[in-house]
Amino acid sequence: MDEDSPAPSLQNIIDQDSLRWIFVGGKGGVGKTTTSCSLAIQLAKNRESVLLISTDPAHNLSDAFGQKFGKDARPVNGIDNLHCMEIDPSGSIQEMIEQAQSAGGAGAGMTNMMQDIAFSIPGVDEAMSFAEVLKQVKSTSYSVIIFDTAPTGHTLRFLTFPTVLEKALGKISELSGRFGPMLGSLMGGQGGPSADDMFAKLNETRATISEVNTQFKNPDLTTFVCVCIPEFLSLYETERMVQDLTSFDIDTHNIVVNQLLYPKKGDDCELCSSRYKMQQKYLEQILDLYEDFHIVRLPQQTQEVRGVQALEKFSNLLVHPYQHIEN
């Protein structure tokens, strides 16, 4: 390795105390959740409080740690300053609608109209997932928040929500000037919240989203860790993801290459040898393409990485580069 090349570890993330938001993403099946859990464990050793959030509908955090997590943050057994939560996007919007409908009366008609408007917005379930995150984060004070994201395409949509929601809420606020009095007479007369209260809440949400949007584009506060395996499709997805992140002005300078094979000397396994050669070809391409990135190389594990102890052991590979010793 060139002496001028960035260190092949995620120690740079651990050392960057200013980081507030860390996204971990990649193609499905590359070890994204294992990496995000392991990074969270390492950060918990250096930060006062860490929150790990799953925005992947599959929700593998519970399986990884071997304990049940839900929409409210809960501490990881044995690591008191690390909390996890799993967000159900569809549940978030359904809960909002049910709460609004419970008011009944004439306001229910307005609720149905708002429901129709809400569901006509592309990606609204994921947007509500983002709103759920904001609500949770605003009521707490975690030092750093890590997102175990959905597979690649969903991840990038999630990162654009601050901009999308900011524009949408801006338009809704404009409508308040034109229809505010009418909504006030419809809603206020039913003993529910007034239109002014509703629009004030929308404006408050927009301000929060705008603030977070600015933070996402600040490399001192936000970074994205790409996880891949040394195969063509994964490399292709990673390149597309890096380009998209760059176009969104979101910092990314760390890539984790997972599931690397290291056949033993004298091993006559033809399949192992063939896969090793293929992996080395794509690993070289990754090293050439991203020479200014921190590229972490992780070996294929002989057993599933599940439970706190196994994750702690695996997490050391993120900060202490793996050294293969031939027998």
UniProtKB/Swiss-Prot annotation:
Superkingdom in the source lineage: Eukaryota
UniProt keyword annotations, A-Z: ATP-binding, Cytoplasm, Endoplasmic reticulum, Golgi apparatus, Hydrolase, Metal-binding, Nucleotide-binding, Transport, Zinc
Localization per Swiss-Prot or TrEMBL: Cytoplasm; Endoplasmic reticulum; Golgi apparatus
InterPro entries: Anion-transp_ATPase-like_dom, ATPase_ArsA/GET3, ATPase_ArsA/GET3_euk, P-loop_NTPase
GO molecular function: ATP binding; ATP hydrolysis activity; metal ion binding
One Gene Ontology term, aspect cellular component: GET complex
Protein EC: 3.6.-.-
GO BP terms in the entry: tail-anchored membrane protein insertion into ER membrane
TM annotation in the entry: none
Annotated ATP binding sites: K27, G28, G29, V30, G31, K32, T33, T34, E231, N258
HAMAP family with a match to the protein in the record: Asna1_Get3 (MF_03112)
Family: Belongs to the arsA ATPase family.
Protein name per UniProt: ATPase GET3
